[in-house]
C-alpha cells in the first residue's frame, strides 16, 4: 500500500493532469423520448492543451453535465496532437482546413497581433499556446465542424525542418539563405 509521500496512482494522475489546460467549447442538451416522457442527457465538447504545442479535443456524453465534461476531457487527453509553432507563438505558414461544410483559414501573424479568432477556434489556440494568429471560419458554424476543421488545418502544418528533411535539403537552402548571407550579397553589389 502506498504511504504518504511515496506517490501512488491517484497522485501521479493529478500531477499529469495539472500540465494541461482545458476549455469547454460546447455543451448540448439532448432528449431521448421514452414511454414515460423524455429522458435528458448532455453532450460536451472539450479542448485540452499543454500550451507548449500539444492540443486535442474530445466529446463526452452522460446524463449529468459534470460527468459529460469529465468524459470529454479524458477523450481529449487521449487524442493529443503536436503542432509545430514558429518561435513558440504562431504558425509557420498559412493553411486551410475543412470538415463537412465547415472551412477554416489560419494565417501566421506578426508578434503582438494576438489571437484573432472566433468561437471554438479561440479555445483551441489558447490551449495550444499560440499567441499570434488570424483565423477565419467559413460555411458551417457548428462547433463540432469548426473544431474538426481547425484540427485538420493544424495537422497540415509543417515545420521548415520537416519539409527540408522530406526534400533532402538543408533548412538554410529551403529558406533561401546562403552561406555568407547578406554581407556577401552586399559586397557583390
Curated annotation (Swiss-Prot):
Cite the SUPFAM superfamilies for this sequence: dsRNA-binding domain-like (SSF54768), Ribosomal protein S5 domain 2-like (SSF54211)
Q: Name one GO biological process term.
A: translation
Name the keywords, alphabetized: Ribonucleoprotein, Ribosomal protein, RNA-binding, rRNA-binding
Q: Name one Pfam family in it.
A: Ribosomal_S5_C
**InterPro entries, per database record:** Ribosomal_Su5_D2-typ_SF, Ribosomal_uS5, Ribosomal_uS5_bac-type, Ribosomal_uS5_C, Ribosomal_uS5_N, Ribosomal_uS5_N_CS, Ribsml_uS5_D2-typ_fold_subgr
User: Which GO MF term does the entry hold, naming one?
Assistant: rRNA binding
Q: Any idea where the S5 DRBM domain is?
A: 20-83
State whether keyword Cytoplasm applies.
Answer: no
Cellular component terms (Gene Ontology): small ribosomal subunit
Identify its protein family.
Belongs to the universal ribosomal protein uS5 family.
Functional summary from the UniProt entry: With S4 and S12 plays an important role in translational accuracy. Located at the back of the 30S subunit body where it stabilizes the conformation of the head with respect to the body.
Q: How does it assemble?
A: Part of the 30S ribosomal subunit. Contacts proteins S4 and S8.
Q: Tell me the domain comment.
A: The N-terminal domain interacts with the head of the 30S subunit; the C-terminal domain interacts with the body and contacts protein S4. The interaction surface between S4 and S5 is involved in control of translational fidelity.
| Name of the protein this chain belongs to | Small ribosomal subunit protein uS5
What is the source species?
Methylocella silvestris (strain DSM 15510 / CIP 108128 / LMG 27833 / NCIMB 13906 / BL2)
Q: What does UniProt list as this organism's lineage?
A: Bacteria, Pseudomonadati, Pseudomonadota, Alphaproteobacteria, Hyphomicrobiales
